[in-house]
């Protein structure tokens, strides 16, 4: 399981200025605030025209000329300046992959000490949708046993403050534990690099992550559909 929320994409104006620096073509930039008419970016030169609901909400929109230049540039360094901030809740086994693929530029997280003791462990804290009980193999019910053991260690830690019980939680905790919410900063260039590697990944979480990439604003700058 993976949960992505509080997404914010920024840096478009800086990226466009930097992209146009080599040719001194800043005056050709046609992006700006949407007002639905000639004051600001109008519908005729809006790159988001086809999918727009035409609410004229004074949001910033990418112009067709800027969009066309972005699509044509072979050296797309401007993507590094389009920053994406988001919160991700995912299991430990996914976070290990996350750092392997270097998806994030910066990550803020809580300390393991405070996080593990904050609440009792429940089945909802684990990604276990693929666990089954089959014949003599009781994989799913074994998780219940582990949860009981974790809660026993947690209670002893809260009562005694003895760190040896905290170690019981740390070293017994399964990689499927997904109560791991972290705030991530990345950019369009990084997402462009990892998308081809991850979109057909064995882990469901990476497939869902790539679906999220596909839904980002102007995601055509990130990947080529085939």
Annotated model-derived regions:
Residues 1-225:
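Family-specific signature for flavin-dependent thymidylate synthase
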């Amino acid at each position: 399981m993976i949960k992505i929320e509080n997404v914010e994409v920024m840096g478009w104006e800086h990226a466009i200025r930097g992209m146009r620096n080599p040719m001194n073509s800043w005056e050709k930039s046609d992006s700006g605030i949407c007002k639905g008419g000639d004051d600001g970016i109008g519908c005729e030169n809006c790159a988001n025209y086809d999918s727009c609901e035409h609410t004229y909400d004074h949001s910033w929109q990418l112009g067709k000329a800027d969009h066309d230049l972005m699509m044509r540039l072979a050296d797309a360094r401007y993507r590094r300046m389009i920053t994406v901030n988001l919160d991700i809740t995912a299991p430990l086994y996914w976070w290990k992959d996350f750092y392997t693929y270097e998806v994030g530029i910066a990550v803020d997280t809580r300390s393991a000490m405070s996080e593990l003791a904050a609440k009792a462990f429940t089945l909802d804290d684990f990604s276990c949708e693929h666990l089954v009980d089959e014949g003599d193999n009781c994989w799913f019910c074994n998780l219940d046993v582990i949860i009981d053991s974790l809660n026993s260690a947690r209670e002893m830690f809260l009562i005694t403050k003895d760190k040896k019980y905290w170690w019981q939680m740390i070293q017994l905790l399964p990689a499927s534990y997904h109560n791991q919410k972290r705030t991530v900063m990345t950019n369009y260039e990084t997402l462009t690099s990892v998308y081809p590697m991850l979109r057909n990944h064995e882990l469901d979480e990476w497939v869902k992550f790539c679906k999220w990439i596909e839904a980002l604003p102007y995601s055509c700058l990130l990947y080529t559909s085939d």
